[in-house]
Swiss-Prot record:
GO molecular function (one): glutaminase activity
Catalytic site positions: 75 (nucleophile), 166 (charge relay system), 168 (charge relay system)
Any one Gene Ontology cellular component term annotated for this protein: cytosol
InterPro entries given in the database record: Class_I_gatase-like (IPR029062), PdxT/SNO (IPR002161), PdxT/SNO_CS (IPR021196)
Protein's recorded name: Pyridoxal 5'-phosphate synthase subunit PdxT
CDD domains: GATase1_PB
Annotated pathway: Cofactor biosynthesis; pyridoxal 5'-phosphate biosynthesis
Subunit and interaction comment: In the presence of PdxS, forms a dodecamer of heterodimers. Only shows activity in the heterodimer.
Organism from which the protein derives: Staphylococcus carnosus (strain TM300)
Catalytic activity field: aldehydo-D-ribose 5-phosphate + D-glyceraldehyde 3-phosphate + L-glutamine = pyridoxal 5'-phosphate + L-glutamate + phosphate + 3 H2O + H(+); L-glutamine + H2O = L-glutamate + NH4(+)
Length: 192
């Protein structure tokens, strides 16, 4: 399968590496037209306000709001997928959750943890950098996959997966593989 990484900011190369390690083709997505060529899209971390501004500038918001393309958001990508953000309206509003930005602290408060992620594994390496957390799940359709210190850090809803951390900054590509082999594959199979 062809999996795109939105290449406007963030660790694009690292995500592409994880896609390839998962046995699939990674595509650096810089133009809206490329969305037609891929089976799923990863929204990488970075700075969420900048990411939203760039998505508006290049026409990605409208295209993705109207799409059922499977998407995987990491850190800032999770914020972009959220229905609501504490203190402001959500952006793509694909995951029926409320997120709080930078809830684990500033850059100096970054940390690594080993997570038990439902349906994937109980020893997933996770890097948290100015990470958000999911304050609230607003629908029974949202499945909580993992928590850290009682804060929700990974969820799945339909075609969408969101995590607070940066799986691409480790050598552990199992979260990306889960997105492709389960969420993207199920969507592709259902569309046939």
């Amino acid at each position: 399968m062809k999996i795109g990484v939105l290449a406007l900011q963030g660790a694009v190369r690292e995500h592409l590496r994880h896609i390839e390690l998962s046995g699939h083709e990674g595509v650096s997505v810089k133009r809206v037209e490329q969305l037609e060529e891929i089976d799923g899209l990863i929204l990488p971390g970075g700075e969420s306000t900048t990411l939203r501004r760039l998505m508006n500038l290049y026409g990605f918001k409208e295209a993705l709001v109207n799409s059922d393309l499977p998407m995987f958001g990491t850190c800032a990508g999770l914020i972009v997928l959220a229905q609501d953000i504490v203190g402001e309206e959500g952006y793509l509003q694909k995951l029926d959750i409320t997120v709080e930005r930078n809830s684990f602290g500033r850059q100096v408060d970054s940390f690594e943890a080993e997570l038990d992620i439902k349906g994937i594994a109980n020893d997933i390496e996770a890097v948290f950098i100015r990470a958000p957390h999911i304050e609230k799940v607003n629908s029974d359709n949202v499945e909580i996959l993992s928590t850290v210190d009682d804060k929700i850090v990974a969820v799945k809803e339909g075609n969408y997966l969101g995590v607070s951390f940066h799986p691409e900054l480790t050598d552990d590509y199992r979260v990306t593989q889960y997105f492709i082999d389960h969420i993207v594959a199920e969507h592709k199979h259902a569309a046939v």
